[in-house]
Amino acid sequence: MAVFLKSIIFAPMKEFLQILRRFVPPYKKYLGLSILFNILSAVLNIFSFAALIPILQILFKVDGGIRVNEYMHWNGDWGSIKEVATNNLYYYIQEFIVVHSASTALLVIGIFLAFMTFLKTGAYFLSSATIIPIRTGIVRDIRNQIYQKINSLSLGFFSEERKGDIIARMSGDVQEVENSIMSSLDMLFKNPILILFYFVTLICISWQLTLFTILFVPPFGWFMGVVGKKLKAHSIEAQALWSDTMSMVEETLGGLRIIKAFCAEEKMNKHFNQVNSSYRDNIMRVNIRQQMAHPMSEFLGTILIVVVLWFGGILVLDYGRIDGPTIIFYLVMLYSIINPLKEFSKASYNIPKGLASMERIDKILQAEVEIKDKETPEHISSFEHQIEFRHVSFAYTDRKSAELVYVLKDINLVIPKGKTVALVGQSGSGKSTMVDLIPRYYDVQEGEVLIDGINVKDLAVHDLRMLIGNVNQEAILFNASFKDNIRFGKTDATDEEIANAAKIANAYEFITKSEHGFDTNIGDRGGRLSGGQRQRVSIARAILKNPPILILDEATSALDTESERLVQDALEKLMKTRTTVAVAHRLSTIKHADEICVLHEGRIVERGTHDELIRKDGYYKKLHDMQQV
């Protein structure tokens, strides 16, 4: 038995138990109730089946129908408690038969059996019902933890991970954990109790027969443990292929226009079919192995029953150690213990699949949060003086060479309060990276970024970002109403404040003309709106937040002339009295900036006003002339 438990439980289930230690504590009361009802179920099951012995003795007239014994006093020297209890039970049945007849005694014992079975099944139901809140609660908690972790991770994490893979972990892997691991909770908290009580009962009935039975259990456990380990390896591969499938679906949905424009439907279909077929082949192997659990445990259980029948028959026929009804009761108890053991074997196939998924989930849950507060961060509620880049250098690690590739090199820049500074340059020169350092989406490798003389690493991240408003090239909106999108950064805003923000952003007119006004749903990512409308809604959102620092990252580069005019007008209203850092592709939009910094290969190569830079006849002048052609 010990070897069996080691191969079936402690090998594949050690990780399982570690997972439960992480997630079960909030549900201890349900766990306690489940254990209580499982104990009741086991005890009631034993007593209900124990009623079979006198029934069989009456039916088959063993010892003349029932043993004839004298009543034993409990304080007498009559042997063990078991012997006294058994003797007195038969004594009362014997007296009942004498008074009421054997058929009546049979009916009463049958009613007792039915009543005990009713209580047993009730306890069994309650034990399973109390597991459900644990199972569903843990799955909910895992999803919450993944989502919260996603929100806490830095943007750098997602530049190295595919969105489809993350979605697959949130959906497919969590679902697999629920199906494979959480479905085994009932097995874990119920079956050990049943096995313990039934095993003790088997020893009480016949320790010789039980000892003989134990000899056959370890080989069964070893076989199932080996299969379970192989199943986990295949499951990890299957879940990785599922992530590839989800990633391709996500990429396809985001690139449908390009796919259609290049007539690449057939090409993408073939590629998806290859990925999907690989997943199918792998998951098929996993499921075939999983389906082995029931027939294999059924076959091994039958072998065990046959062996016990043979050895038990010897004890009955040759030695007379136990009688026929007792051996039948023993077989019933043995069959009862086989079912929980079958569940363990089934779990040894199921749980490795869930553990493989949990490994992938933990890659997110245990990922290091690089951007976080210090133990004692400085708090800030207002912006008073300036933003400063002091000898700032920023690099990312190249995946192939593992070397640092510098995007920014020794940047020095002071942005006084109330001023507008524009960053221009070719694609890849580091403009967007530079503005991403202000709200601390990334941390610099060298130098420091300061707000009012305080390093942003020393500030509370929440306080820092509450000072900053963002309007990006791609207006990021949510599948909600106009109202909910505009008040995203200020949930307590009044309807009047929301309307005023929309008016300043030149969005009020088209919002009020929509079907339900400010309560109109704008669709996934604002898909029901034009590019200019989406941008004006995002500007209204920034206006309502009313931040002292504003970051504009090519906010008008993807718009037509009319939309650009409306958006530019809204931006100019937004920029009044605010400190603004603008990344610009169209130089015409930043002519009036207080200072323009020209970036080239990660360095500031020129700086000054528009007129000053034109007179320099340098890099900025070349960019300007190219846009005039």
Region spans (language model):
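Membrane-integrated ABC transporters
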Residues: 1-50, 59-113, 119, 126-131, ...
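ABC-type nucleotide-binding domain
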Residues: 4-9, 374, 380-629
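Extended non-transmembrane interhelical loops and adjacent amphipathic helices
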Residues: 10-21, 57, 64-93, 129-175, ...
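An intracellular "coupling" helix at the cytosolic face of ABC transporter transmembrane type-1 domains
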Residues: 25-29, 155-156, 172-181, 185, ...
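Hydrophobic alpha-helical transmembrane segments of ABC transporter permease domains
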Residues: 36, 123, 127, 171-216, ...
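Juxtamembrane helix-loop junctions of ABC transporter transmembrane domains
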Residues: 45-53, 107, 112-163, 167, ...
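Hydrophobic/aromatic residues within transmembrane alpha-helices of membrane transport systems
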Residues: 56, 115, 146, 150, ...
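Helix-loop-helix
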Residues: 201-215, 224, 289-359, 364-365
